Amino acid sequence: MTMASKSDSTHDESGDEAADSTEPESALETARRQLYHAASYLDIDQNIVERLKYPKKVHEVTIPIERDDGTVEVFTGYRAQHDSVRGPYKGGLRYHPDVTRDECVGLGMWMTWKCAVMDLPFGGAKGGVAVNPKELSPEEKERLTRRFTQEIRDVIGPNQDIPAPDMGTDPQTMAWLMDAYSMQEGETTPGVVTGKPPVVGGSEGREEAPGRSVAIITQLVCEYYDQPLDETTVAVQGYGSVGANAARLLDKWGATIVAISDVNGAMYEPDGIDTASVPSHDEEPEAVTTYADTVISNEELLTLDVDVLIPAALGNVITKENAEAIAADLVVEGANGPTTSTADSILADRDVAVIPDILANAGGVTVSYFEWLQDINRRAWSLERVNDELEAEMQAAWRAVKDEYENRDVTWRDAAYIVALSRIAEAHEARGLWP
C-alpha cells in the first residue's frame, strides 16, 4: 500500500500552544490548536474563530449523595456547552476521578467538530462528575446520577442538550438520567439522552456503532489506496466495544486480523485470528491473552509490520518515542486522541496515512442521532435500517473529507477539520451575532 505524500506538519502556527512539548497537551489545548490549524486553510472571519475558542456556557454543580453507610459525600459535576449554531448540544457524560472543567470544555469542542464533520444537526458538549465509579455501589451510582440530573435539569433537554454514555457510564446510567428528568417534567422524555437500553427508547446498534464506523472507514480507505481487503493485515489495540466490533467486521469482510489486545497484552497470530472465538472485554473482561498461543506486549503490537493499525484503546499511545517505529501503512483511530501532535507530524513526514478519530469513530454520535430521531418521532428502527443509514452517513462524510484531502494537499486529519470548521463557520455567518 503506497501512501500519497501530503502536508508535512499538523502543528498549530499560532504559537499559543507548544505542540511538541514534553508534557501531553490537555484536551482544551489540543482542541484550540486544531481549530487554529484548520482555520489557517480557510478564508473565514477570524471573529468566528475567536468565538469558537471558548465554550458558550460551563455549568458547575455540587452533588451531595448519601453513601450506603449513612454518611454524606459531596462531588463536583460539570456540563460544558461549546457551540450550538448547528443544533442542540450533544456529548457524553463521564464518571472519572480526573474529570475537570477544562477537560470537559476541550472534549466538548471535539464534539462540535465531530458532529460537523458528520453533518449532524448538533453542536458539541461534554460533562461529567469527578468520582471513581469503581468505588460506588450500584445504589450509590444511581443516587449520584439522579441528583446530578436534578442539578443540570434546566440546561439539558431533547432540543437543548442531549447527553450520552462515556467513560464510567453506560446504558443503565442513561436510563436513570432519563427517568429522573422525566419525573420532573411530568412526562416520559426519552429524547433527553441517547445510549439508553432499547426497552426505554434506545436504538438497536448503538453500542456497536463506533466499531462499525471504524470498520467502514477502514474498508473505504483501503479501497482508496487500491488495497484489496482480502489481502490486508490488521492489528487492533483494544478489544472492547470499539476494537472488538471493528475487528470482527473486518474479519467477516475478508481482512486478516493478526493481533488484538487488552490491558494484559496482545494475542498475535500471523495467519489470522478467528475474532468471533475471542471474547470482547464486555463478554469476558481482560481475557484476550488467555486465548493466545503467542503473547506480545501492547507496545509491540503498535509496531507490527501490518497494512492497517487500529489503536482502539487509550489516548496518546502513538507518541514521538514510537512514531518512527510504526510499520503500518495506515492508522485508523478507533480511540479518541490515540496519536499525539508530535507523533502525527512524524507519521505525516513518513507518508503514513492517519485517519482521524473525529471521522473514524463517529458512528457512536451518528447512531445517537438516529436514536434521538426515533425518540422524538416515537418510532423504532430495525437494526438493519440503523446499519444501512450509518453506512450511508459514513460514506457521505468520507467523500467530503476525501475531496478536501485531494483538493488542498493536506493530511487526512487536516481535511476532516477543514470540513468541520467550514460547516460551522458557514452556519455562524448565516445566523450572525446578536445583539
UniProtKB/Swiss-Prot annotation:
Q: Does the keyword NAD apply?
A: yes
Pfam families in the record: ELFV_dehydrog (PF00208), ELFV_dehydrog_N (PF02812)
- Catalytic activities: L-glutamate + NAD(+) + H2O = 2-oxoglutarate + NH4(+) + NADH + H(+)
What is this enzyme's class at the first EC digit? oxidoreductase
Another remark in the UniProt entry says: Strain NRC-36014 contains 4 distinct glutamate dehydrogenases while strain NRC-1 contains only 3. GdhX is only present in strain NRC-36014.
Q: Which family does it belong to?
A: Belongs to the Glu/Leu/Phe/Val dehydrogenases family.
Quaternary state and interactors: Homohexamer.
In Swiss-Prot or TrEMBL terms, this protein is called: NAD-specific glutamate dehydrogenase A
